[in-house]
A protein has these predicted regions:
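Core domains of carbohydrate- and sulfate-ester-processing enzymes
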Residues: 189-243, 362, 463-465
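A generic secondary-structure signal for well-formed alpha-helical elements
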Residues: 15, 56, 128, 147-150, ...
């Protein structure tokens, strides 16, 4: 009997080979469906693939952890369909081998955040369309670089913020606000939750299945650290085979070296919805002042950097105030009386919206009933929804519609619902929140020039030095 544990052990051992033999390229899919490769096969990658598998042929998997990434994904049974058979995807440990294949149409980039920009740009340079998980980038500099690449190489590029497809909450909020039913929006409160803390995490042997040097990528070369205990995460309830505390796997989110804590983890969702709902879609729609004085971190900081390197270091409590030239104030906070979600306060009323829930007087009066299918399609950049079902009232359907939107744009043209230009504005605000919080002061931003002004130290956080061999590509 093949148990899940035995399958993972065998598959993980096989996947330890650095590079797999490159298969003979096929000019087109045997099934007529697009061919997709997933670069990054952790929890988010597998979640995305569970929806893509209904729409495309998944022909390649790549992950630097042969056990947790590759083997877990093979267990899920995704692959190329031949009648009733499923042909397993080819597996790789180096994403460059995937990009060399001329029979792959698109790639899913579901790696940790510090790898997004390099892989996404190189994928577009190789002629691939890209579905890049959120947050878009690691730094402000990367925002501009990836936007330039999308426009230069002309590939379809979708950011993995599926909340724009939530028909039962966020889309209704956008229709209300864009329709002027709340009047002029004066105040927005964005509750994204605070980051977890960790104990001191000891040095540990690097797992045999993990290429630690490759996982670190552009980030500084540091020791692998991990706790002895194993733990579940929201995305990995069945994969409790990795440490509860470490630098990688799900826990990379809580280190500024690789991510931005909740500012980028949930900020990429809720800040995005706040801006999108108000129709603020261009980088020059951004704030002019970001106040980070009310923020706390779990470890000591000096000059914006953690003074210890063996504990989670992203902000646990915060109220980051973004002030706009027109008087709008947006508070990005870890906690609010309304809970996780977005509160919009206008001159005519207010609503609070989160995943699967929207409340306010207008909602009680039944305003959502007046919105028609064409209103939702307009929010979807004119791209029709999947013809397979009219039920878009669940989160599951929203995840699917977001992937369908990407594939439809590849096949028929059009601007994806989560396009790069609007997401640069979102990512700018996410990173500015982190910089202001790390320095604990007010910083000023020039939205038109996309730069921090009057503060050389804060401006130095706009970019990072990449480790030799992992530099960002030229565009």
């Amino acid at each position: 009997m093949t148990t899940r544990r035995n399958f993972l052990k065998a598959a993980g051992a096989a996947a330890l080979t650095p590079y797999f033999a490159l298969p003979k390229a096929r000019a087109e899919s045997d099934t007529g469906r697009l061919r997709l490769a997933s670069i990054g096969c952790g929890g988010q990658g597998r979640l995305d693939m569970s929806y893509f598998d209904k729409l495309v042929d998944i022909v390649a998997l790549c992950d630097v952890d042969s056990n947790f990434g590759i083997a877990e994904t093979l267990w899920c049974g995704y692959g190329r369909k031949e009648g009733d058979k499923v042909i397993q995807p080819d597996t790789y440990s180096d994403y460059r081998r995937v990009l060399e294949r001329d029979d792959i149409d698109a790639v899913l980039v579901a790696t940790p955040d510090h790898w997004h920009t390099k892989i996404a740009i190189e994928a577009m340079q190789a002629g691939k369309h890209v579905f890049c998980e959120k947050p878009l980038t690691l730094t402000l500099e990367e925002n501009r670089l990836i936007r330039e690449a999308v426009h230069k190489y002309g590939r379809v590029f979708q950011v993995g913020t599926m909340q724009r497809c939530f028909n039962n909450s966020f889309m209704i909020a956008a229709l209300i606000i864009r329709g002027g039913y709340l009047g002029e929006i004066k105040n927005v409160v964005i509750d994204i939750g605070g980051c977890p803390t960790s104990p001191v995490i000891p040095k540990a042997p690097v797992p045999e299945s993990l290429d630690w040097n490759m996982w670190l990528g552009q980030a500084p070369l540091v020791d692998y650290i991990a706790s002895d205990d194993e733990g579940n995460t929201p995305w990995e309830p069945a994969a409790a085979s990795f440490p509860a505390y470490s630098r990688c796997h799900y826990q990379f989110r809580w280190w500024y070296e690789y991510s931005g804590g909740k500012f980028t983890d949930w900020g990429a969702h809720h800040i995005d919805i706040a801006l999108w709902a108000m129709g603020r879609q261009n980088p020059d729609d951004g704030p002019v002042e970001i106040d980070g004085r009310d923020a706390e971190h779990p470890v000591p900081y000096k000059d914006g950097y953690a003074t210890v390197d063996n504990q989670f270091n992203t902000a646990t409590r915060f109220n980051i105030y973004h002030k706009f030239a027109d008087g709008l104030v947006m508070n990005v906070c870890d906690s609010s009386k309304d809970g996780n979600g977005i509160l919009f306060e206008g001159t005519k009323g207010r609503i609070h919206v989160s995943r699967g829930r929207i409340v306010g007087k207008l909602i009680e009066e039944g305003i959502a009933e007046q919105f028609k299918e064409e209103d939702y399609i307009a929010l979807n950049n004119g791209i029709p929804f999947s013809p397979e079902t009219n039920d878009r009232e669940t989160q599951d359907r929203a995840f699917y519609e977001h992937k369908y939107n990407f594939i439809h744009c590849i096949q028929h043209g059009g601007k994806p619902v989560s396009d790069v230009d609007s997401h640069v504005l979102t990512a700018n605000m996410c990173h500015l929140s982190g910089i202001a919080a790390r320095l604990g002061r007010v910083i000023h931003w020039d939205p038109a020039k996309e730069t921090i002004v009057g503060d050389d130290q804060a401006a130095s956080f706009m970019h990072r030095e990449q480790r030799k061999g992992f530099e960002l590509p030229e565009v």
